[in-house]
Amino acid sequence: MESRLLQGGTEGMSGVPKISVAVPVYNEESIVEELLRRVLAVLDSLPGGPHEIVLADDGSSDRTWSMIEQAAARDPRVVGVSLSRNFGHQAAIGAALDHVTGDYIVVMDGDLQDPPEVISELLAEAQKGFDVVYVIRIKRKESMMLRVCYAVYYRLIASLADLDLPVGAGDFAILSRRVCDLIRQSPERQRYLRGLRTWYGFRQKGLEIERDARHSGNSKYSLRRLVRLALDGVFAFSVLPIRLATALGAFVVACSALFAFYSLIVKVFFGHSPEGFTALILAITFLSGVQLLFLGVIGEYIGRIYEEVKQRPHYVVKQVVRKTNSGA
């Protein structure tokens, strides 16, 4: 199996490659038509084909899925994958990747903040021998609050994760077939795509672009979801939180030993014990809070282990729509 997976990379690829674009969408009825128009226009400009766009609908409650169905019925290049409920952004990306057929796979969000016109540049770089070409976002056009949150998020991941994750790089990237297959076969229940593609290695390169403003509607990434994504990145690729708990525990033990030694000296040589009832209460309260915090950290790791051992699927597909070239 491993030898098969390592085939189909960038080295030695002959002929004109087929391109697949994998896009997760959720309640994007105001964007779907423009998204398809721009992506298909880019695919039309590329040699070879037939290329395709695979849209994974993550349990939308608006007209997103019906619009995808209509587009897929008209155009064999459009493939729709409907999930049975909302499984989350990363799961929807996984669903799209599981249905692509291309030699190179572009992963991008459906809000058009990642300009589809960059796909041709990504492909050109990938054909120079790179298995992954990821986009580094510069000059983001979101609100100041979101820009600050994203800046904190990227630096948190870079400092805590046991990977050299590039700052500013999101999910927008082009993958070789072998990297795509490796990600697809990853058994992790809670995948963190940008971490996985870095972990697998191979030749990678970053491409800086200026990110567009959202085409319409509101961002589906709330502060809570952004925090959740950051935690996924940290807990999936680092044991540093556990090590911090160990280090802090050792520090507290050392401080306690020093204070006990100090109390003994004061008692022996001065005949009384150090006073400080308020300080004692504050110390107990502080240490209790620290203990609860790190119990939460340990609980997070245990909870993720629990999710892994249940072996539930990453997502459940309700329907797939794909028109064949014969019109069937």
Briefly describe each language-model feature range.
Residues 39, 96, 111, 133, ...:
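Residue-level signature of catalytic and energy-coupling elements of molecular machines
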Residues 73, 98, 124, 128, ...:
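Solvent-exposed polar/charged
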Residues 2-18, 192-328:
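Hydrophobic helical membrane-anchoring modules
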Residues 85, 110-112, 177, 209, ...:
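Short, conserved catalytic or interaction motifs in soluble domains
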Residues 2-142:
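Structured catalytic core of nucleotide-sugar glycosyltransferases
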Residues 79-85, 89-99, 104, 116-196, ...:
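Acceptor/aglycone-binding surface of glycosyltransferases and processive sugar-polymer synthases
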